[in-house]
Amino acid sequence: MARIAGVDLPRNKRVEIGLTYIYGIGRSTSNKILKVTGIDPDTRVKDLTEAEIAKLREEVDKYQVEGDLRREIRANIKRLMDIGCYRGIRHRKNLPVRGQRTRTNARTRKGPKKTVGVRRAK
């Protein structure tokens, strides 16, 4: 079991895919890492040697991943909310931040519908 950046990589997957289980590493970053280390992307994680795993660890350590990345993202969002800019206000109100419409849709961000009752006139 290869453990890199505090994440156990799935044994039966290709290294290219296995690296994407690390938060902050996607397919393109994974391919860059493999190109630099000289490891074949089609190799299975279980077939990696200790030397190759050490190379991968060393290369992944150059990137900001897992807890550090999550912490930085959280700090950036908190900073936006503290300075009170438009994006910060949208984060605070749990609304879409990037200009999407909210008259309809935006249910993922807003949560389930809150039906407003209608008063009947007597």
Swiss-Prot record:
Gene3D superfamilies: 1.10.8.50, 30s ribosomal protein s13, domain 2. It comes from the Bacteria. InterPro entries: Rbsml_uS13_C, Ribosomal_uS13, Ribosomal_uS13-like_H2TH, Ribosomal_uS13_bac-type, Ribosomal_uS13_CS. One of its GO terms (cellular component) is small ribosomal subunit. GO terms for biological process: translation. SUPFAM superfamilies: S13-like H2TH domain (SSF46946). GO terms for molecular function: rRNA binding; structural constituent of ribosome; tRNA binding. Part of the 30S ribosomal subunit. Forms a loose heterodimer with protein S19. Forms two bridges to the 50S subunit in the 70S ribosome. Located at the top of the head of the 30S subunit, it contacts several helices of the 16S rRNA. In the 70S ribosome it contacts the 23S rRNA (bridge B1a) and protein L5 of the 50S subunit (bridge B1b), connecting the 2 subunits; these bridges are implicated in subunit movement. Contacts the tRNAs in the A and P-sites. This is Small ribosomal subunit protein uS13. It comes from Halothermothrix orenii (strain H 168 / OCM 544 / DSM 9562). The gene is rpsM.
